[in-house]
Amino acid sequence: MKITYLGHACVVLQGSKCVLIDPFIPEGEIRVTPDLVAVTHAHADHMGIAASYTAPIITNNEIAHYLRGKGCITEAMNIGGTIVVDGISFTMTQAIHSSWLEDEGIGMYGGSAAGFVISMDGRTVYHAGDTGLFSDMRLIGELYHPDVALIPIGGRFTMGPREGMMAAEFIGAPVVIPIHYNTFDKIRQDVSEFARAINETTDMKTVILEPGMEYEIKK
């Protein structure tokens, strides 16, 4: 499986299928035709252009209901549930964050924010979504044994580097990829310091990806 980072919390998982998570940047700049789209919560920086794709969208009940009204194909689920779509397993996990929709200037509840454990071609990736640190991340590691953990470190709206490092230790994935940082000034972080701390004090490896860069999970 290959992971391509597209900036903010948007990543592409490419294997037997193409999974786009939390589309954010303009469609013309993504240059990917996903088979499936996963949306962790309803904020505009994560739903983004999801509604413009014809691919099925995996998300929570509230967002799925909203997107169906826009003509989208959806696969609704909720925290703790697992579904298999086109041979790809999606488990929705807890995230500590808010979630709301806006339609024609009217705000609406967007259901619970979430993360995803996604398994494809014998490899497993945990995308934490936007979240604060919570101790049950240990259970995610124990239950699903992800090969890679995608962890937000921007601070202010999610965990910062200190909490992100503890999250990485809780999860225990051999590879950590930081996300959701440096998109704008309020979430600017020194990602090299985060990587150094993990690489020097744990057995895990931190992979820093600039937008457009890829990481391949070796078999």
Curated annotation (Swiss-Prot):
Signal peptide: none annotated. InterPro entries: Metallo-B-lactamas (IPR001279), RibonucZ/Hydroxyglut_hydro (IPR036866), UPF0173 (IPR022877), UPF0173_UPF0282_UlaG_hydrolase (IPR050114). GO terms for molecular function: hydrolase activity. SUPFAM superfamilies: Metallo-hydrolase/oxidoreductase. The keyword Hydrolase applies. It holds the Pfam family Lactamase_B_3. Keywords: Hydrolase. It comes from the Archaea. Belongs to the UPF0173 family. This is UPF0173 metal-dependent hydrolase Mhun_1705. It comes from Methanospirillum hungatei JF-1 (strain ATCC 27890 / DSM 864 / NBRC 100397 / JF-1).
